[in-house]
């Protein structure tokens, strides 16, 4: 007499290992696609945010007949910092009127517009304010700590701490001007204490960059003297990025000096960029131990594809590859409002407003 056989259900060890292996292979095949889809969505979101910035500048220009200045502020000799940046000026056109009014109420101000004189210089349109982030007794002005999602690229992993001022991944173009781009004239659409007119962009709005992405980066920037900084290839040999007061004295809260680490601040290291070195390259500033130093500041992004989104004068947003033609980087940078051709190829030409370069749009 035979005992009835008892059937066993479930996987054997070998079968289980086979199933796990198959699942692992499927995950390996699908994960890159999922990650790519997420990055594509983030890049599209970034593109839309930049379109909003382009529209805000167009509406600002429609209201005041000029574009915002790179920075403006106090004319009080005891408080010489003109630090309010262009992003502050366009807040009302980004549906941020309450924040704009909060900033006005926190300090004694005039107004942010360029409506008072034909040349677009500061004149009576100045506002009186301390260095962003501090009051007269070195306290914090609360609105400077506000963070705006609109000014952050979704692909940037860095997040501000509560004690830091808000970051920005979007900056204004000062073209190929290096020396004194913090305080003097530039060959781009934006410069300090001057509200430029659309009509000045004789190269054509569709071929003139207004804004680009920048990387918020906390690494040390290289400090250079004039002779080194004036020739881009010399600064590009310095492989450190970011910004610091000095290698021996790193920044501490709340006055962080990192690239893009103050969206309210019009100093070049925070809210402007040059069209000299290709997107994603290094930045360098003048060795004057100040976060207001001029320098050669590059565009950059955290997108998987190498390059940056740029807002053009016609409101379009286009992706510029890091491999764009940058001309001859051994040549010194132009100065002032010189309207000669940029020595820095298509990238330099897209930043200038009236230098007469002919850039093939199909090459971008």
Regions found by a protein language model. Name each.
Residues 7-42, 46, 52:
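N-terminal single-pass transmembrane signal-anchor helix
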Residues 35-364:
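Internal low-complexity, small-residue/proline-rich segments
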Residues 1-6:
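N-terminal secretory signal peptides that target proteins for export/translocation
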């Amino acid at each position: 007499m035979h005992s009835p056989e008892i059937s066993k259900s479930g996987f054997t060890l070998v079968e289980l290992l086979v199933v796990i292996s198959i699942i692992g292979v499927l995950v390996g095949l699908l994960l890159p696609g999922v990650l790519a889809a997420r990055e594509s969505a983030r890049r599209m979101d970034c593109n839309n945010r930049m379109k909003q910035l382009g529209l805000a500048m167009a509406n600002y220009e429609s209201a005041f007949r000029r574009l915002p200045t790179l920075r403006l502020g106090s004319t009080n000799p005891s408080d010489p910092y003109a630090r309010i940046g262009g992003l502050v000026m366009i807040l009302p056109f980004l549906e941020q009127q309450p924040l704009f009014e909060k900033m006005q109420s926190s300090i004694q101000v005039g107004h942010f517009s360029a409506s008072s004189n034909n040349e677009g210089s500061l004149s009576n349109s100045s506002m009186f304010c301390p260095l962003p982030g501090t009051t007269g007794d070195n306290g914090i002005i609360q609105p400077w700590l506000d963070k705006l999602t609109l000014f952050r690229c979704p692909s940037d992993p860095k997040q501000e701490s509560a004690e830091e001022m808000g970051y920005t991944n979007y900056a204004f173009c000062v073209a190929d001007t290096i020396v004194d781009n913090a305080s003097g004239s530039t060959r781009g659409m934006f410069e300090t204490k001057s509200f430029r007119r659309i009509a000045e962009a004789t190269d054509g709005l569709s071929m003139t960059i207004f804004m680009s992405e920048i990387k918020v980066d906390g690494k040390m920037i290289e400090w250079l003297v004039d002779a080194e900084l004036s020739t881009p290839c010399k600064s590009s040999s310095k492989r450190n990025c970011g910004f610091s007061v000095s290698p021996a004295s790193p920044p501490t809260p709340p006055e962080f000096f990192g690239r893009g680490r103050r969206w309210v601040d019009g100093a070049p290291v925070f809210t402007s960029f040059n069209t000299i070195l290709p997107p994603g390259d290094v930045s360098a500033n003048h060795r004057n131990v100040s976060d207001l130093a001029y320098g050669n500041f590059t565009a950059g992004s955290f997108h998987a594809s190498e390059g940056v989104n740029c807002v053009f004068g016609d409101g379009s947003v286009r992706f510029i590859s890091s491999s764009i033609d940058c001309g001859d980087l051994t040549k010194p940078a132009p100065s002032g409002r010189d309207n000669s051709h940029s020595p820095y190829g298509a990238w330099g030409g897209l930043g200038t407003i009236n230098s007469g370069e002919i850039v093939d749009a199909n090459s971008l």
